[in-house]
Amino acid sequence: MSQPVDPSNNAPAFMATSANNLVGRVFMPSELRFAAMPPLALYIHLPWCVRKCPYCDFNSHLAPESKFREVAVPVRSLNAKHVESTEPAEQGYAASLPLDLQRRYLNALIADLDQQLPKVWGRKLYSIFIGGGTPSLFEPSLIDELLAAVRARLGMPQTGEITMEANPGTFEQARFEGYRKAGVNRLSIGVQSFSDSHLKALGRVHNGGQAIDAVRSAVALFDEVNIDLMYALPHQSVDQALADVKQALALNTTHLSLYQLTMEPNTLFAAKPPPLPDDDTLVDIEEAVQGAARNAGFEHY
């Protein structure tokens, strides 16, 4: 059993005892002190999506009662060679979650933060990452409230980094502007590919033209922009993977995240694997895309 004792006058702050003897270690107050409290990075999860991607094993869900209306996307689309085309683009989505669901979840997040505050008192918050799911389904006004609640409780320097994930399939200019006004200064856009055929194979709700528009808008608005890009996609050749990376580099973002498509447990792709590049092609793809990124001045880490 454990018995607390008086920590005054240099007495032990905690002593572990048993029925027969004193267990070997006594913790003194000085052992629990830091010269400086370590800084704090905060992750906030917003779990809903327009659609569950077949490769995704993250905690993400199609929200009940979600309302997704189809809208016309820019006429510009990308053909297989990633050249602008005049062919009509597919329909896109303007998506929103029910406001009462957003409000209830926001209130729950703030209540959870209040509960955890005693564990992080004295630590300086230096970054916030809002991930998902698809955080860009949330209204900018509620993202503003969320960040204001965090700042009020933890404080944050003006130079602190606030990242938010966004899906090109939910891109609307006014939303991006609203997130920027709320304090988001780094946007991470889940492009995955600029090829319409590969995006369809991945179950994505956007096309290549939408991805380009979303990234261009983000670059104009935010201090930092990241593109998430996947390679070793179903039926993908080395040239196609390289074309994706070259298109991403041409958009002049500050960061590029390259991921190999993998078959994760408990996903549709794990149950029904699509035809992926063979090992030799995979090696060639990795060398090509990493080399292109290095040649553009990006450092691998």
Question: Which residues fall in each region the model found?
Answer:
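N-terminal [4Fe-4S]-dependent radical SAM core
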Residues: 1-43, 88-94, 121-123
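Low-complexity, intrinsically disordered/propeptide-like segments
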Residues: 17-18, 25, 49, 77, ...
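C-terminal scaffold of the Radical SAM
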Residues: 29-41, 59-74, 78, 82, ...
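Local cysteine-cluster metal-coordination motifs and their immediate loop/turn environment
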Residues: 45-60
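Ser/Thr/Pro/Gly-rich low-complexity, intrinsically disordered segments
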Residues: 84-86
